[in-house]
Design a protein with these regions (language model features):
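Terminal amphipathic alpha-helical/low-complexity segments used for targeting or macromolecular assembly
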Residues: 1-61, 181-248
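Solvent-exposed, flexible loop/coil residues
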Residues: 32-33, 38-41, 74, 80, ...
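Structural signal for interior beta-strand "rungs" in well-ordered beta-sheet cores
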Residues: 63-174
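A structural signal for small-residue-enriched, beta-sheet-centric alpha/beta enzyme cores
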Residues: 172, 176-183
Length: 248
């Protein structure tokens, strides 16, 4: 496919996916994300041909022009839409599939691990039709499965299966294959705060058992069923918020 065909295809894709796009001419003239993607085609070709310094210099010029930083070594699929664009960073070994949507502030970066080296794959792979909300960070050599959605502000550090929605810091799955994923065990949410709360709860239970004759600390709820129902209602509210697009 020639460059003119790619430009025509990209403009048509943005016109269909962006409700703010009023005409093909407006998309062509006023879409910094598209400008960055089109420039990357040249930069990537130069990179593969061994003109790496030239490719890097040109990519820096485009970075100042569009606010989008795409390393010339990154591999981008067709019909990539970078909406708004400002602050998007795509690392050298990142791979982006077809029909992917990225919003402003998204980072496809490395973890900074000492095991990372110049010859290893350090950046994520996004499969086809992935949607990434603004200011989300996807870090390391991980894979985001096809048709998955990453919520705004999320930090993704592990693989995401296809057809999933992930939110949070670190990100956890809230939807999979169109079905809500119930988080009934706090151990399923892997983050330092949850670990600290779990350790604290275990410690309190141990101390109560050691005291023996002392009265256990009273709970706010009258019984476990009432407490469980209150937590379930709160989770339902959060899931409804996410299902309506909140945080995505």
């Amino acid at each position: 496919m020639g460059w003119l065909d790619r430009i025509h295809e990209d403009i048509g894709s943005v016109t269909q996916r962006d409700p703010a796009a009023q005409s093909a001419l407006q998309v062509f003239l006023c879409s910094p994300g598209l400008h960055a993607v089109w420039a990357h085609q040249l930069h990537h070709w130069l990179w593969l041909c061994g003109w790496r310094l030239t490719a890097r210099v040109l990519s820096q010029v485009v970075r100042f022009w569009t606010g989008v930083e795409i390393h010339p070594g990154a591999v981008l699929g067709r019909r990539l839409m970078i909406d708004h664009g400002m602050g998007v960073v795509i690392g050298e070994t990142a791979i982006v599939g077809n029909d992917v949507t990225l919003y402003q502030g998204v980072t496809l970066g490395g973890t900074g691990s000492v095991s990372d080296n110049a010859r290893s794959k350090r950046h994520p792979t996004l499969s086809d039709c992935v949607f990434v909300g603004n200011n989300a960070n996807i870090l390391g050599d991980i894979t985001i499965g096809a048709n998955s959605r990453v919520g705004a502000g999320s930090v993704v550090l592990r693989d995401v299966p296809p057809n999933s929605t992930v939110v949070g810091v670190p990100a956890h799955i809230v939807y999979r294959n169109g079905q809500r994923v119930l988080i009934t065990d706090p151990h399923e949410v892997k983050d330092p705060l949850s670990d600290a709360l779990i350790a604290l709860a275990d410690r309190v239970a141990l101390l109560e058992a050691c005291v023996g004759c002392a009265q256990p600390v009273p709970h706010t709820f009258t019984d476990e069923d009432e407490e469980r129902e209150a937590y379930r209602r709160e989770l339902d509210m959060l899931r409804d918020y996410v299902s309506m697009g909140g945080g995505i």
